Amino acid sequence: MKQIIHSFLYGSAVWAACTVSQEVKAGGIPVSTTEDGDAVSPNIVCVVCEDIGPWLHCFGDSVAVTPTIDALAAEGIRYTSIYGTVGVSAPSRAALITGMYPTHINANYMRTQGGQIARPPAVTGYDIVLPEGIKCYTELLRAAGYYCTNNPKTDYQFLPPLTAWDECGRQAHWRNRPKGMPFFAIFNTLASHEQKVWESAKDTLYVSPDDVVLPPYYPEDSIVRRDIAVMYSNIYRVDCFVRQMIDELKAAGEWDNTILIFYSDNGGPLPRQKREITEVGTHIPLIIRYPDGRLAGSIDDGLRSIIDIPPTILSLAGIKPPAYMDGKAFAGKYASPSAN
């Protein structure tokens, strides 16, 4: 469902609590500024995939076919030691929209809202209620003058407030913003989600089962080999999705004005991976590409957490992350010394 937030909401207490002020350039275009008056409104696009560990060629996986993501890594910085807080999507996405540990906001159970086949009939679903004062970080971006869109998945364990997004749904896109307005956009792809291992089982394979390397916890078996080959083929489909997102930015003349961030919500989709609090269940890839070419081709092996992504995005936008966040910014104006 497309959400349109009318102008009267901008005068609400949500905006009053933000540390970022707004000025207006000639022509009526809002521009985010810090309290010091520095312009800090780069466009930011996040491409978010599902159920992928660091099984990308640019992260050292020789089996993976990821030419677009490899090129993105060559132009940006790879974070090789970033982990989720859990091994499954909904609690991870609660963390990704708040910058909080799921346990800190009562979001650590999978799909609290219901919809789980394995849920006992007597156990009813519920929306978590965020503690007072905790917001979706996109509310702070919107307060700073950003046009914020999410396409389409939320899965936060709670319904996002109307103030979270200018648009949220399958048609949500940064192209819909008022002309000249800085944008923050998330595009989610399900191409690599767990279910695609069987849904795509008869689709084209881009990796041969004979070429995959079996982890030591799997038996030598043709079915296992094919499932892993399907997983790698789905990762290639994610690569194609990333190419589409980049091509759209380039076609609109926004590529050289946009920070692009690529990451997964949790680790792998296969047994002993997804849902497990293990290396393969929580280890994710993260790449940040800056339009000015800084840190191109570099690697950061510092220990990071998925809860660090929201404050880092705020910091990259020139917005001071709120003190309540469990995560720490590791890039941008407000990068925390303790995070580096």
Give, region by region, the residue ranges found by the protein language model:
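Formylglycine-dependent sulfatase
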Residues: 8, 18-340
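Sec-dependent signal peptide recognition
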Residues: 2-13
